């Protein structure tokens, strides 16, 4: 009976993950650095070197050195994912950061209404992020990220749909005197693409695609050469 229960639970978990993977803004949930992806993305309380503001914006308030990072992933089915990030401390107790994430699909064969081939096209999703964080106490910081979002979707050689919007992340980070760090983040608050199809389709309209909001709680244990991280997250 227990075996059947775990099999059913596993299937339901996979199906639920597939549903959320197809929601808007998936490129922001794929992971940027090899280290964070290899560790399951559980970096709410862990510093992702070179990309400190992606998982928890409050981390920028604890930076002591400038952080610059860039990555590019050539994915299957002609997909791409690229990111560039810069973050630095802002004396005496703050930190700032800016980042750009780009994703899309290349080598899309366009066709005319007759079926003949036209030009090659590509899609593009972009997020520009501005981060500010402040240490309230030496052991506690709060941070926020503003995201400017844009999605370019080609229809024909001359027609293109563009969706745009704004979203927010907030994060809290607490460091203990010993070996533990705790973090809380809420990602993609009010993030969305707003589309206007009136210029392309005769009966077009304005509508919004909302990103799922992610709530995370995480912890890190770091002592000498041992680092343990853990995250619990809920997607709504």
Regions found by a protein language model. Give the residues of each.
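N-terminal processing/targeting junctions
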Residues: 12-15, 34, 60-63
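Positively charged n-region of N-terminal signal peptides that target proteins for export
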Residues: 1-4, 138
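N-terminal periplasmic accessory domains that precede
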Residues: 51-62
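Sec-dependent N-terminal signal peptides
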Residues: 4-13
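Outer-membrane beta-barrel porins/channels
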Residues: 18-46, 65-68, 73, 80-236
């Amino acid at each position: 009976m227990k075996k059947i229960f775990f099999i059913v639970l596993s299937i339901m978990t996979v199906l639920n993950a597939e549903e959320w993977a197809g929601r808007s803004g998936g490129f922001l949930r794929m992971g940027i650095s090899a280290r964070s992806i290899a560790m399951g993305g559980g970096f709410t309380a862990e510093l992702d070197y070179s990309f400190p503001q992606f998982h928890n914006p409050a981390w920028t308030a604890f930076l002591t050195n400038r952080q610059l990072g860039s990555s590019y992933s050539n994915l299957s089915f002609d997909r791409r994912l690229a990111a560039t990030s810069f973050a630095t401390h802002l004396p005496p107790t703050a930190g700032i950061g800016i980042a750009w994430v780009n994703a899309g699909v290349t080598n899309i064969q366009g066709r005319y209404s007759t079926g003949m081939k036209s030009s090659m096209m590509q899609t593009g999703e972009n997020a520009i992020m501005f981060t500010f964080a402040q240490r309230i106490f030496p052991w506690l910081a709060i941070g926020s990220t503003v995201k400017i979002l844009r999605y370019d979707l080609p229809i024909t050689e001359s027609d293109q749909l563009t969706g745009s919007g704004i979203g927010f992340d907030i994060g809290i980070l607490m460091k203990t005197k010993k070996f533990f760090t705790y973090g809380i983040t809420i990602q993609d608050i009010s993030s969305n693409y707003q589309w206007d199809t009136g210029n392309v389709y005769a009966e077009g309209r304005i509508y919004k695609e909302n990103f799922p909001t992610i709530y995370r709680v995480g912890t890190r244990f770091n002592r000498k050469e041992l680092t343990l991280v853990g995250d619990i997250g809920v997607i709504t």
